[in-house]
């Protein structure tokens, strides 16, 4: 094992997290967070590179890639330093970027989502280097500043940039908060897919007292929305809950109570399991809308509902990770440090793991997520130490299994 001089401050997850929280990196601003992270990693022997991603019509975003080692096996840790806005700062018990500790908890925006996970993984690898030397292989940090934003200039472009330079990975751990109640509850081994769209129905505007002279698009829109939500798309699968579609908005752009609107629109999102792909779901949704729009009882004496369907860009495909070395190493580390056997889950929303899956097997494990995005976001100091221990045990176990 090669030796690198360890930065003693990097071995303390609390110090690491306080440093990161004090950087106001509200998406897409870097806020000093990537510079602070680089200052932790470089003394450990990491080669740190900064990459600025650009796309017309979107803000430039700074990202970071750091690697220790040149040989395989290669473990990636992925995450983000950007955070959501703080809301009304006056509602916070402590200033959101002060990283105050009170009652055994560390307060600050990003404490849970997900500067805490980064702080713990840095501490874990720093302790490993200090006690055992660098792992026999390579370890890297892939950290974006565009996860809480549109995710255009973040992980996708950073992965493409790194892969174009010849980087290849054997496995990835994403440090997102995965635990519902207690540290050790849950590992995410996959994610449902996500597909969104908008339906537009055009009618004829008129006076509410003279409906025969108008054509109310809301009547048709209600039927189309019902057709999307019922019946259920499926009953779920072995590893996934049932697919679920929600109509999230219905708008007519009309504030008057005596005017029949000329246009109605509705947006929807479906979280889908491995019964479907985005392509097969599009076909199913169009079939449901066509059937509902042609119902002769809906518009007697009038033509079928004319609707327009607009799909949102970049649907997320469903995925499931089946990699024994990765999952068993992490599960064993969690059980060793907490005494809990973690559930292997695919619940919840999407994450940047959906991009990483195309490059290597990926799982997610981090802190307890109860206060993420909330006023007074906070983490138990004891959980930071425990997560650092879990990550440390995982690093040792994974390199042992992957190098065997």
Curated annotation (Swiss-Prot):
Disulfide bonds: none annotated. Binds 2 Zn(2+) or Co(2+) ions per subunit. Zn(2+) 1 binds at residues 80, 113, 176. This is Succinyl-diaminopimelate desuccinylase. PANTHER family: ACETYLORNITHINE DEACETYLASE, N-ACETYL-L-CITRULLINE DEACETYLASE. Catalyzes the hydrolysis of N-succinyl-L,L-diaminopimelic acid (SDAP), forming succinate and LL-2,6-diaminopimelate (DAP), an intermediate involved in the bacterial biosynthesis of lysine and meso-diaminopimelic acid, an essential component of bacterial cell walls. The gene is dapE. Keywords: Amino-acid biosynthesis, Cobalt, Diaminopimelate biosynthesis, Hydrolase, Lysine biosynthesis, Metal-binding, Zinc. Belongs to the peptidase M20A family. DapE subfamily. PROSITE patterns: ARGE_DAPE_CPG2_1 (PS00758), ARGE_DAPE_CPG2_2 (PS00759). It is an enzyme of class 3 (hydrolase). InterPro entries: ArgE/DapE_CS, Bact_exopeptidase_dim_dom, DapE_proteobac, Peptidase_M20, Peptidase_M20_dimer, Peptidase_M20A. It catalyses: N-succinyl-(2S,6S)-2,6-diaminopimelate + H2O = (2S,6S)-2,6-diaminopimelate + succinate. Homodimer.
């Amino acid at each position: 094992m090669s030796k690198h001089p360890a930065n003693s401050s990097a071995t303390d997850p609390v110090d690491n997290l306080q440093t990161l929280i004090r950087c106001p990196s509200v998406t897409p601003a870097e806020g000093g967070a990537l510079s602070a992270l680089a200052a932790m990693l470089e003394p450990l022997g990491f080669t740190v590179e900064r990459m600025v991603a650009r796309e017309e019509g979107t803000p430039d975003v700074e990202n970071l890639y750091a690697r220790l080692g040149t040989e395989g096996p290669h473990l990636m840790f992925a995450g983000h330093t950007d955070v959501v806005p703080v809301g009304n700062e006056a509602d916070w018990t402590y200033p959101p970027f002060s990283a105050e500790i009170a009652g055994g908890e560390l307060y600050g925006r990003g404490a849970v989502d997900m500067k805490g996970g980064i702080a713990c993984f840095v501490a874990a690898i720093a302790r490993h280097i200090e006690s055992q030397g660098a792992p026999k292989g390579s370890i890297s940090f892939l950290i974006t500043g565009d996860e809480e934003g549109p995710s255009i200039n973040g992980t996708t472009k950073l992965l493409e940039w790194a892969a174009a330079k010849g980087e290849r990975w054997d496995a990835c751990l994403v440090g997102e908060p995965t635990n519902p109640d207690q540290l050790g509850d849950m590992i995410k081994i996959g994610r449902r897919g996500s597909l969104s769209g908008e339906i537009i129905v055009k009618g004829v505007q008129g006076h509410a007292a003279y409906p025969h002279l108008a054509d109310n698009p809301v009547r048709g829109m209600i039927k189309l929305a019902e057709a999307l939500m019922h019946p259920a798309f499926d009953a779920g699968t072995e590893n996934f809950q049932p697919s679920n579609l929600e109509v999230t908005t219905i708008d007519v752009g009309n504030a008057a109570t005596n005017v029949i609107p000329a246009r109605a629109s509705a947006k929807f999102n479906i979280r889908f399991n491995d019964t479907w792909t985005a392509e097969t779901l599009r076909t199913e949704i169009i079939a449901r809308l066509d059937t509902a729009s042609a119902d002769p009882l809906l518009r007697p004496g009038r033509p079928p509902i004319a609707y327009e369907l607009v799909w949102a860009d970049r649907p997320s495909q469903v995925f499931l990770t089946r990699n024994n070395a990765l999952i068993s190493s992490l599960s064993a580390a969690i059980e060793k440090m907490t005494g809990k056997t973690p559930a292997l889950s695919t619940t919840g929303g999407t994450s940047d793991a959906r991009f990483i899956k195309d490059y290597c097997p990926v799982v997610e494990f981090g802190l307890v997520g109860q206060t993420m995005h909330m006023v007074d976001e906070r983490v138990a100091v004891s959980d930071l130490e425990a997560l650092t221990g879990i990550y440390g045990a995982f690093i040792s176990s994974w390199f042992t299994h992957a190098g065997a």
